[in-house]
Amino acid sequence: MTATKQHKKVILVGDGAVGSSYAFALVTQNIAQELGIIDIFKEKTQGDAEDLSHALAFTSPKKIYAAEYSDCHDADLVVLTAGAPQKPGETRLDLVEKNLRINKEVVTQIVASGFNGIFLVAANPVDVLTYSTWKFSGFPKERVIGSGTSLDSARFRQALADKIGVDARSVHAYIMGEHGDSEFAVWSHANVAGVKLEQWLQDNRDIDEQGLIDLFVSVRDAAYSIINKKGATFYGIAVALARITKAILDDENAVLPLSVFQEGQYEGVEDCYIGQPAIVGAYGVVRPVNIPLNDAELQKMQASAKQLKDIIDEAFAKEEFASVAKN
């Protein structure tokens, strides 16, 4: 796409709880002028397209329809939420092999359509599937993006905001690493309206050190808590995806925590996709924002990346995946 293009087209692949919530977010936030929805359950996509179209009189004009893979050919953005859902007691990394097979089939068909836009991946394990989308598509790394730690960082900011009594939009803090159990909080750069969190807490005494540890654990494990209560998470990630979509379609050059390709931005972290802040616009990732990590944070980044890299290497050692890799 070009930064000045007026008609912006999104194709969503995967019309489950996350996908349909994302589609709803696009409609209510007036994002994009065209939305095609693909799923193996065709009647579901037809029903959702019809249902969503009934909201347009309250929002803004938009073409919404049940799409085919051939419709991807002129899309600006393809959003991948298709995959087996995470079950109670299951980690995101437990999903690897079955969702790699789904990812391979989906990406192959999208590329065959002539698609030349940007991939945004949200299916879990998102860092692994963003990497596999890059491998299977042959696309430049800048045009394959994962939702990464966007939701985790939002949860982190909201949790801190609730504790200290400010608007979450005034809290600037990131979760980095895997979107999953090995993620970590970048405490060294967390701030409230420009005041370092450490200084803020000294001045206001809103929470002690153990409270901060407990807060991070609640953020890291939030998905498990929600899955145990209602079976799946979808509203938060849907709005996170809508935010990323807007940044891309409107060429915002926004800084967002995403799953982006690693080629030595951090010592010992290479050839994987992992969560870190990045500038994103109409052409995908403009460049990663390499927050200087302290020694403890760097070790956590390296450990998180190693866990992902080991899984990637094991998966792509298998002929069924290695044989179709283009990158």
UniProtKB/Swiss-Prot annotation:
Regulation of protein activity: Allosterically activated by fructose 1,6-bisphosphate (FBP).
Catalytic activities: (S)-lactate + NAD(+) = pyruvate + NADH + H(+)
Keywords for the protein's UniProt record, in alphabetical order: Allosteric enzyme, Cytoplasm, NAD, Oxidoreductase, Phosphoprotein
Binding site for NAD(+): 18, 39, 44, 69, 83-84, 122-124, 147
Family, as annotated: Belongs to the LDH/MDH superfamily. LDH family.
Residues that bear Phosphotyrosine: 224
Superkingdom of this protein's organism: Bacteria
Designated name of the protein: L-lactate dehydrogenase
GO BP terms: glycolytic process; lactate metabolic process
Catalytic EC class: oxidoreductase
Residues reported in the UniProt entry to bind beta-D-fructose 1,6-bisphosphate: 157, 172
Subcellular location: Cytoplasm
Protein function: Catalyzes the conversion of lactate to pyruvate.
Name of the gene encoding the protein in the UniProt record: ldh
